[in-house]
Amino acid sequence: MERIKELRNLMSQSRTREILTKTTVDHMAIIKKYTSGRQEKNPSLRMKWMMAMKYPITADKRITEMIPERNEQGQTLWSKMSDAGSDRVMVSPLAVTWWNRNGPMTSTVHYPKIYKTYFEKVERLKHGTFGPVHFRNQVKIRRRVDINPGHADLSAKEAQDVIMEVVFPNEVGARILTSESQLTITKEKKEELQDCKISPLMVAYMLERELVRKTRFLPVAGGTSSVYIEVLHLTQGTCWEQMYTPGGEVRNDDVDQSLIIAARNIVRRAAVSADPLASLLEMCHSTQIGGTRMVDILRQNPTEEQAVDICKAAMGLRISSSFSFGGFTFKRTSGSSVKREEEVLTGNLQTLKIRVHEGYEEFTMVGKRATAILRKATRRLIQLIVSGRDEQSIAEAIIVAMVFSQEDCMIKAVRGDLNFVNRANQRLNPMHQLLRHFQKDAKVLFQNWGIEHIDNVMGMIGVLPDMTPSTEMSMRGVRVSKMGVDEYSSAERVVVSIDRFLRVRDQRGNVLLSPEEVSETQGTEKLTITYSSSMMWEINGPESVLVNTYQWIIRNWETVKIQWSQNPTMLYNKMEFEPFQSLVPKAIRGQYSGFVRTLFQQMRDVLGTFDTTQIIKLLPFAAAPPKQSRMQFSSLTVNVRGSGMRILVRGNSPVFNYNKTTKRLTILGKDAGTLTEDPDEGTSGVESAVLRGFLILGKEDRRYGPALSINELSNLAKGEKANVLIGQGDVVLVMKRKRDSSILTDSQTATKRIRMAIN
C-alpha cells in the first residue's frame, strides 16, 4: 500500500512524467534484454517496423543487374546504399513482386516431388467432403496425435542420415544406412532429384516432413488419424463441429491401423499356445505388414495400444509407463501405494485373493469413448469424475473405476460364482474375474454402491444407479463432467520385463499389461498382413488350417521324408502340426495318433510298403499324444465346414484328393500343390535316373552320417560315400563314381542293386 501511495505521489509531479516519457532507454539491463542472444524478443513488432522502412530486405549484389531500378509505375526497386555490415544491397518489397512476375522461369518438374506432402494434401482436400456444421458442447481431450500425413516411420537419426546422403552426398561424416527402408528411400530420392535446382536446405526440410512422424499434444474430439488432424481447425471449435470425410488415405494411418490388428491377432493366438512368449516372438518375426517386417515397424512406430505394447515388450523395447485395466489407460498423477495380498469374500461367499493397493492415489483414466479422474484410498473410492460420449461409455468407465477401487461393497455385489476363463481355458485373475462379472451386468453393483446429496458445482452433474443424470443426488463419489480428461502427455518410455505368460511389468514389479487387456474387437486391416507362422493358419478358419498343413508337408517333403524314416518323434512334435489338432475330435485324437504311428512303423519295417500319399495324408494325425489301443480305422474324421468330414485311410475323399496323373493334391477342392515324385512308381524311374554317376555299395552304413535326400547327393565329391534315402523310405549306401565314362550303365544296374541292397 505504502509503495502505491509513493508511486502515485511521484506520478503527480509533472517532472516524473516527463522523465519517463522523454528520456531514451539507456538502462543496461533493458539494452541487454533486447540485444543479447540471437532470439528475437518481439518478432511481430520487429517485422512491423522493418516492413515500414523503404528497403527492408537485403539481396545479393548481382540482383542489380537482373532487376531494373524502377518498375512500370516508376517506383524504386532497390537502393544504391549497400547494407551496413555486409556486401549486400537493400531492396524494396516491390522488388519481390517484380521478380515473381517477370523474373526467370526454371523447370518445375521437381516441385511435385519435393513438395509431395503439400501436393497430396491439396488432393485430399479437393476430394474430401465437408458435411453440415453442428453446434454442441465439444468434449475435447488432449491426445498425442500424428500431425503430418504421408510420412515414413524413420527415427530422427535414421532420417538425418538419409537426408545427408540424398542432399549432400559428398559431405564427409559417418553415415550408416542400415535399415531396409533407409536404403529404399535413399535410392528412390536420389533418382527423383537428379538435376534438382531447388535449394538443398528446402529439400532437406521437405524430406524431413516425409520421413519422420511429427506428433503434437492437441485437444481432439473425434478422429485421431493424421488425415483428420490436418483439418482439425476446420472440423471442431469450442461449441461446434463440422462433419468431414477425408479425400484419401495415407500409408502411415494404414500402417498404424494394420499394426494394431496384427498385434491383437498375434497376442490372442500366443496366449493359448504352450509357450506364449516364444510363440509371440516367432509370430512377430515371421509376419509382414504391407510388405514390411512387423518387427521393423514395431521398432519405429510409436503407436500405444495394449497388444502392440505387449509385442514391443517381448522384443525388449521400451514402452509407456502407464498401465491398462478394463480397456482404460491408467496413469498415476499423485500419491503412492504398497501392495499386499488379502483374502476377501464375495456376495456368494467365494474366497478371492486380491492384491490390495494400500495408500492414497490419484489417476487419470483414458479410454476410447470416455475419460475420468479417479481419487482413491485403500479399498475406497473417494472421487470419480467421468466424461464420455454417451451413457453407455460413461457406465463402462464407472464399472472399471469401481472394480479398481477394490471397495468391499463392490465385492459383496457379486451374485453367483466367478469362473471366467481366458482363451487358453485358464482362470482369470481375481481382478479380471470381478471386472468381467460386472461388465456383464452392473445393476447390483450400482444399486449397492450408495447415493449422496450433491452440491451444485459448475460443469458437474450427478448420476443415479440407473445412469440417469441428476442435479440433486448421485452415486457416492461419482460425478459426470462436461470436460474431458487429457491423455497423459509425456512420451517417456520405460524399460519393462515380460514373463512367459505375456504379463508386462515395470521395474518395480507392477503389472502394466496382460493378454486379458487386449481388445476382442475385430477389424479389417487396410494393408495386407502376411502371417508366415503356422500358428496363424487358424485365423482364417479350419479350412485354412487343413490346406496350410498339407501345403507345408508337400513344400518340405524332402526333409519330412528323411525325418519320417529316421527320427519320427521329432517330426511328430513339429509345431506346424499343432493347429491341425483343433480339427480332430478331442475324444478320439489319441486313438487316431496311436493307430497312425503303428501303421507308419509297419511301413518302416516291411520293405516296399512305403506310400508317399498315405504318409502325407495321415502324418498330421500322428502329432497328438498317442493312446495305445487295438482299434483299426478305415477313415479319420476332421471338423471342417461345421461338421465332421472323413479322410479315407486308403483312397481319395473330398477332403484329401490326390490325382495320380496330374500329381496334384486338392484339399476340400482347393489346390494344395504338386508332389515332385510319384509315390507309386517304385524305384525304377526317379532313383535310377538320379543315381547315375553313383555306385550302390549296399545297405545303410551309419558311419557315413544321416541319410541324404536325393537332391543333396549332388554335393558329394568324387569317391565320397554317403547314405541316401530312396523312394520307398529305404536307405542305401552309395559312392560317387571317380570316372564319368561308366555313368551310362548305372541306370540299368541301379535298379537291380537297390533291390539286392534292400533284400
Swiss-Prot record:
It is found in: Virion; Host nucleus; Host mitochondrion. GO terms for cellular component: host cell mitochondrion; host cell nucleus; virion component. It comes from the Viruses. Gene3D superfamilies: Polymerase Basic Protein 2, C-terminal domain. The keyword DNA damage does not apply. Disulfide bonds: none annotated. The record marks 627 as: Mammalian adaptation. GO terms for biological process: 7-methylguanosine mRNA capping; cap snatching; DNA-templated transcription; symbiont-mediated suppression of host cytoplasmic pattern recognition receptor signaling pathway via inhibition of MAVS activity; symbiont-mediated suppression of host gene expression; symbiont-mediated suppression of host mRNA transcription via inhibition of RNA polymerase II activity; viral RNA genome replication. Keywords: Cap snatching, Eukaryotic host gene expression shutoff by virus, Eukaryotic host transcription shutoff by virus, Host gene expression shutoff by virus, Host mitochondrion, Host nucleus, Host-virus interaction, Inhibition of host innate immune response by virus, Inhibition of host MAVS by virus, Inhibition of host RLR pathway by virus, Inhibition of host RNA polymerase II by virus, mRNA capping, mRNA processing, Viral immunoevasion, Viral transcription, Virion. GO terms for molecular function: RNA binding; RNA-directed RNA polymerase activity. A motif (Nuclear localization signal) lies at residues 736-739. It holds the Pfam family Flu_PB2_2nd. SUPFAM superfamilies: PB2 C-terminal domain-like (SSF160453). Plays an essential role in transcription initiation and cap-stealing mechanism, in which cellular capped pre-mRNAs are used to generate primers for viral transcription. Recognizes and binds the 7-methylguanosine-containing cap of the target pre-RNA which is subsequently cleaved after 10-13 nucleotides by the viral protein PA. Plays a role in the initiation of the viral genome replication and modulates the activity of the ribonucleoprotein (RNP) complex. Belongs to the influenza viruses PB2 family. Influenza RNA polymerase is composed of three subunits: PB1, PB2 and PA. Interacts (via N-terminus) with PB1 (via C-terminus). Interacts with nucleoprotein NP (via N-terminus). Interacts (via N-terminus) with host MAVS (via N-terminus); this interaction inhibits host innate immune response. HAMAP family: INV_PB2. This is Polymerase basic protein 2. It comes from Influenza A virus (strain A/Leningrad/134/1957 H2N2).
